[in-house]
Regions:
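Non-catalytic, mostly N-terminal accessory regions of nucleic-acid modification and defense proteins
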Residues: 5, 10-243, 247-248, 317-326, ...
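Hydrophobic alpha-helical scaffolding
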Residues: 203, 256, 293-297, 336, ...
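C-terminal, active-site-flanking charged/polar segments
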Residues: 412-413, 425-475
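Short, contiguous acidic/charged loop-to-helix segments that flank catalytic cores in large enzymes
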Residues: 65, 348-365, 391-399, 420-427, ...
């Protein structure tokens, strides 16, 4: 038996079997215990990263140089392999447990040829033909957890619509309608499949490691999107999640989800801190309804769905939706909102929901409209941590002031964390801050906590190399003990500002408005001494000039 994925998955399967049939309890908990155990003894090593880089280089060498396109194509292949892995488990369940399990792949010759474990042994041209002409069209037409078959002429036979409950894989497949297969050559496809198969067979021990692997690939996205969105660094996401401390009972949303990084970080936090106490209903909620995301980029939706699936979210609730539009009718649905919404981009004001326009004085600025959206979609008592450009904090337009006033007067503004401008490099050098507030609809803002983050553990240039200086642990510790912050002076890195002072300053939330700087007095020499030094310097210049003229005249 190959060590790694097969061994670990088989062990989890066997343990789960005995747990289900001899103790008759929630086998999901035992499966989770297995996953957490294996997560503790495996990690993404430099060798694994080198293998990923090699796959990446092979694709780039063939002319596919857009990082997003590369990840998208690899995502499709990971999904294809995941289907075959699940099929192997289904067959085991039928054979060993006698369960009536629906199989994913058709039993025809073409259907079985579409399985990763079968086509990977063929030559490059045959693999390319099977994947491009059969597997890819099949996953785009997947329904009810099953792939369609093909007739003797190679024509796809659609699966009829029924009321059958959706399978977890359907939540990814539903975003495949506009997908295109653009791996350029048979040779490149063979190299990708061989490389991925090597990773899964020898290096990727479990689902958590697949998630870590995917995170590493996503870290290669080094450019901002056309709508002003860019990927939030993982350590910043994790800090924001730790500040909010989500629980298994929460319903979490990112209405501008991108690659679903915030949802993944929240999921990992819940598992790490609450898994031992979660019951069957908690796990069901965790796998299906706890995490929701919206985006208008279908490529991002496919990537985010895969990202969530690889982090144990069986039914990823990510949907195509313009969060700011009139078509988005979500109200008071979530208890936690985590987001880094786009700061710019095209916006058709006529399509913006009236509720958002009324709060923001008919603004077209997406960063303000998203803040209004967060207030609308949160349940009463729900909390938001979001990233905004500094302009939101001090902008003097009617829209800026109105929105800040709404949050401060009608809800509970808890914290402003000012981040250095290099946090989002190499995407952008924009200065940003984290806003933390709770929806109350009855006020509650008393003292607002400000923190001036100076370092996040990485250099603030384009290279973003690890450094020792890091304020994140201090931010979390001070926020958790915010009652002890009242004695801090305005010259310190964090301090509290009374609501009335903010109101008196036109609802300005920029930290520099309230931060005090200690100026160390500089002692200068007497004026007579300064003049004497200038005179001596002037005499020296004159002497040197005369000597230079003498040398030139010789």
């Amino acid at each position: 038996m190959v060590r790694g994925e097969i061994e670990n998955n088989w062990l989890c399967f066997v343990v789960s079997y005995f747990y289900r049939y001899y103790w008759n309890k929630n086998y999901v908990i035992m499966k989770e215990t297995c996953n957490l155990f294996f997560r503790g003894i495996h990690m993404i090593t430099g060798e694994i990263k080198n293998k990923v880089d090699k796959i990446w280089e092979n694709v780039w060498a063939a002319g596919l140089t857009n990082p997003l396109s590369v990840i998208e194509q690899i995502t499709y292949l990971m999904f294809i392999r995941a289907l075959d892995d699940q099929e192997i488990n289904n067959i085991r369940s039928k054979t060993l447990l006698g369960e009536d399990v629906e199989l994913i792949f058709p039993e025809s010759d073409i259907g079985q040829a579409m399985r990763w474990s079968n086509f990977k042994f063929r030559n490059a041209d045959e693999i390319y033909n099977i994947v491009s002409n059969f597997v890819f069209p099949a996953i785009k037409a997947m329904k009810h957890g099953k792939l369609p078959d093909f007739d003797e002429h190679g024509k796809l036979i659609p699966i009829p619509d029924t009321d059958e409950t959706k399978d977890g894989f359907d939540f990814f497949a539903k975003h495949m309608a506009t997908a295109t297969f653009i791996v350029p050559t048979a040779q490149v496809l063979e190299k990708i499949i061989t490389g991925l198969d090597d990773l899964y067979t020898h290096d990727i021990a479990n689902l958590d490691m697949q998630g870590d692997l995917y995170e590493y690939m996503l870290s290669k996205l080094s450019t901002a999107g056309t709508n002003g969105q860019f990927r939030t660094p993982k350590h910043i996401r994790e800090m924001m999640v730790r500040l909010l401390k989500p629980t298994p009972k929460d319903i979490i949303c990112d209405p501008a989800c991108g690659t679903a990084g915030f949802l993944v970080s929240a999921a990992e936090y819940v598992r790490a801190n609450h898994s031992k106490k979660m019951d069957k209903n908690d796990w069901k909620h965790y796998e299906s309804n706890m995490f929701s995301g919206f985006d208008t980029d279908t490529t991002m939706l496919r990537i985010s769905a895969m990202n969530l699936m690889l982090h144990s979210i069986k039914y990823p609730q990510v949907d195509y939706k313009d969060s700011l539009s009139k078509q988005n009718d979500v109200y008071e649905a979530y208890t936690v909102c985590l987001a880094n919404p786009p700061f710019k981009g095209s916006l058709n004001a006529a399509t913006v929901h009236g509720d958002l326009r009324s709060i923001t004085n008919n603004t077209k600025k997406t960063e303000l409209l998203f803040l209004a959206l967060f207030l609308r979609i949160l349940k009463k008592g729900g909390t938001c941590a979001c990233i905004v450009p500094d302009g939101v904090l001090f902008g003097s337009s009617k829209a800026h002031v109105a929105l800040r006033k709404e949050i401060i007067e009608n809800h509970h503004l808890r914290a402003i964390i000012s981040m250095p401008s290099g946090v989002f490099k190499p995407y952008a050098g924009v200065s940003t801050a984290i806003l933390i507030f709770t929806k109350t609809q009855a006020g509650g803002t008393d003292n607002v906590w400000f923190y001036d983050m100076k370092a996040d553990g990485f250099s603030l240039d384009d290279k973003r190399q690890p450094i020792e200086a890091n304020d994140i642990a201090d931010i979390i510790d001070r926020f958790e003990h915010i009652d002890s912050e009242s004695d801090r002076k305005r010259t310190e890195q964090s301090f509290l500002v009374p609501k009335q002072e903010i109101v008196d300053n036109g609802y300005d939330l920029s930290i520099n408005k309230y931060k005090e700087i200690e100026y160390i007095p500089v002692e200068y020499p007497p004026t007579s001494e300064i003049l004497a030094n200038i005179k001596a310097l002037n005499e020296q210049i004159m002497a040197d000039t005369a000597e230079l003229e003498r040398l030139l005249n010789e």
